[in-house]
């Protein structure tokens, strides 16, 4: 019997012991009866998205977890961001990830502009698209929250351009670096683009309103992750001969899923932010599993809480995710399904960024050899029967349990 599969990524799930939580991690601190139930009837382990000690970006981590070698396939974040906001790009386009940020006296004081809403970001992006002219064709489009996408048409040869993002607050933006004449041209265009966009943003009514309300203004653009068309050798759906769907709100992860052949769905209320409607996602997964062989579910807010150094909020979000998972397992046949739960990487609250810590992994459902673990958490995962594996081992293990793998050899 061929089983169906559900892969759930709780973004930035892994963490470190936190004094505020009594020496527990947010996952260990959280009340997670549904994931604990799966742990008791499943098998735990740890996974390194790239390799031990290597912090992973969300893009490279997801590529790896879906079974691709990011060192061979990855050509920058920007292209995935662009695919994720629904742009169909040409192979000679150059795409970038952009943050709306707050600049004061030449210093970046907030890299996410107070986590402005998606609606605000889209209005600001529209104004930039309409009012900025840098002498080349470009597309500037809001994504999720403080995120946006910039595409320079026909300029892929300039991909060796650097970022202006200092990646920490309290420092001035970087100048765009370059390595050759093509990337020098792109760097000059980006400098002009950022300057003109800054002028548009400073006077925009949304920022005037935010000033009056005492909120951080979104008056600057931090641009990074120059990306060209990814080198995907074979679609996920072709490699595993499955019909695959994804339930995602965040543009970057949507882009990765689109690039490898998933049909992508975003139910109403799914925002990728703290206010996301996780139950709408759960219901969509159950609905899609009737027509698809493999369903991927992405939950973003846990990562944001790690970046914001909010341990108790991260634990609360994990509890919300657990209820989402509870709805799913209550409405599917676990014997005919394989379910895997992990994070794309660790985002420890103390680091406020991605780290190279391994990520706890849980697999349960039909055909799974159980171990003696009792609940889902970092330390319990260290005892699990899966041991410590690589991120790109997860899908092959799932497909084998789903009875969809082909034998190697005679």
Curated annotation (Swiss-Prot):
Keyword set, alphabetical order: Glycolysis, Isomerase
GO molecular function, one term: metal ion binding
EC number: 5.4.2.12
InterPro entries: Alkaline_phosphatase_core_sf, ApgAM_prokaryotes, Metalloenzyme, Pglycerate_mutase_ApgM, Pglycerate_mutase_ApgM_sf
Residues of the signal peptide: none
Known pathway: Carbohydrate degradation; glycolysis; pyruvate from D-glyceraldehyde 3-phosphate: step 3/5
Broadest EC class assigned to this enzyme: isomerase
SUPFAM superfamilies membership: Alkaline phosphatase-like
Swiss-Prot/TrEMBL catalytic activity: (2R)-2-phosphoglycerate = (2R)-3-phosphoglycerate
Described function: Catalyzes the interconversion of 2-phosphoglycerate and 3-phosphoglycerate.
Membership in a protein family: Belongs to the BPG-independent phosphoglycerate mutase family. A-PGAM subfamily.
Protein name as annotated: 2,3-bisphosphoglycerate-independent phosphoglycerate mutase
Organism annotation: Pyrococcus abyssi (strain GE5 / Orsay)
